[in-house]
Amino acid sequence: MSKITSSTLRTFKQEGKKFTALTAYDASFASAFDSEGIDVLLVGDSMGMVLQGHSDTLPVTVDDIAYHTRCVRRGIEHSLLIADMPFMSYATPEQTMVNATTLMQAGASMVKVEGGHWLLESVAMLTERGIPVCAHLGLTPQSVHVFGGFKVQGRDADNAQRILDEAKALEAAGAQLLVVECIPASLAKAITQALTIPVIGIGAGKDTDGQILVMHDVLGISSGYIPRFSKNYLKQTGEIRAAVRAYIDEVAQGVFPGDEHTFN
């Protein structure tokens, strides 16, 4: 199994090969996911909810992400490792550079930021200085209070066009990957077709180049609200590694996400 890079994912896109991503926060789970063939691992600020017990992702700090990035890095050999930049850690280009450097030194191969046009300067700056960027559009959880909750984005024509325009602009600024979350499947398809960089979906239909889920949802250990776009693979397989393989297989075959996991 060869090491996954952003170039690998571009090749997958060109060949029409679907790829998979999961969140990970420690060496043991990361090692299991890596060895079973998960292409991308994200040290997500979702840890604020699934690990720390908060109601949203806002309390997560750069130190939190850096610590868990170091843990995950020690457990993997092949997967591309992305680290989330948490709330208010990239409000200015200067702040972005300092905090992104911290996460790269902790072992990340790429950093992820949430937002559109206001991030273009920072994305270009990071890229020019050797820090790869994954952008994130649609439902951006750090903006949950602006949205008035965890709501599907891009359902009306104006917002759909805005998200598409932002996706193109972020690619032009140098973003190497894009995550789209909780947007209509038709919009996700249009974005995927419009960009040359790989697009990873979560709650965005089956036409994106890859899929990502939170590991706690895949393993059925999330408490409280269970997102519509998630699927408990452990329930159908009974074993963690088998659950991961089932997720990989269903994405590759176009079975997941199904209509029941998709927004229109």
Swiss-Prot record:
This protein's UniProt keywords: Cytoplasm, Magnesium, Metal-binding, Pantothenate biosynthesis, Transferase
Catalysis: reaction(s): 3-methyl-2-oxobutanoate + (6R)-5,10-methylene-5,6,7,8-tetrahydrofolate + H2O = 2-dehydropantoate + (6S)-5,6,7,8-tetrahydrofolate
A GO MF label: magnesium ion binding
Predominant subcellular localization, coarse grouping: cytoplasm
Keyword check for Transmembrane helix: no
SUPFAM superfamilies: Phosphoenolpyruvate/pyruvate domain
A GO BP entry: pantothenate biosynthetic process
Catalytic-site annotation from UniProt: 181
EC numbers on record: 2.1.2.11
Binding, 3-methyl-2-oxobutanoate: 45-46, 84, 112
Pfam families per UniProt: Pantoate_transf
Domain of life (superkingdom): Bacteria
InterPro entries in the cross-refs: Pantoate_hydroxy_MeTrfase, Pyrv/PenolPyrv_kinase-like_dom, Pyrv_kinase-like_dom_sf
Subcellular location: Cytoplasm
Co-factor(s): Mg(2+)
Record: residues binding Mg(2+): 45, 84, 114
Note accompanying the cofactor annotation: Binds 1 Mg(2+) ion per subunit.
Enzyme class: transferase
Pathway, per record: Cofactor biosynthesis; (R)-pantothenate biosynthesis; (R)-pantoate from 3-methyl-2-oxobutanoate: step 1/2
Function: Catalyzes the reversible reaction in which hydroxymethyl group from 5,10-methylenetetrahydrofolate is transferred onto alpha-ketoisovalerate to form ketopantoate.
Self-association and partners: Homodecamer; pentamer of dimers.
NCBIfam families, per database record: panB (TIGR00222), PRK00311.1 (NF001452)
Family assignment from sequence similarity: Belongs to the PanB family.
Name of the featured protein: 3-methyl-2-oxobutanoate hydroxymethyltransferase
Species name: Shewanella halifaxensis (strain HAW-EB4)
Lineage summary: Bacteria, Pseudomonadati, Pseudomonadota, Gammaproteobacteria, Alteromonadales
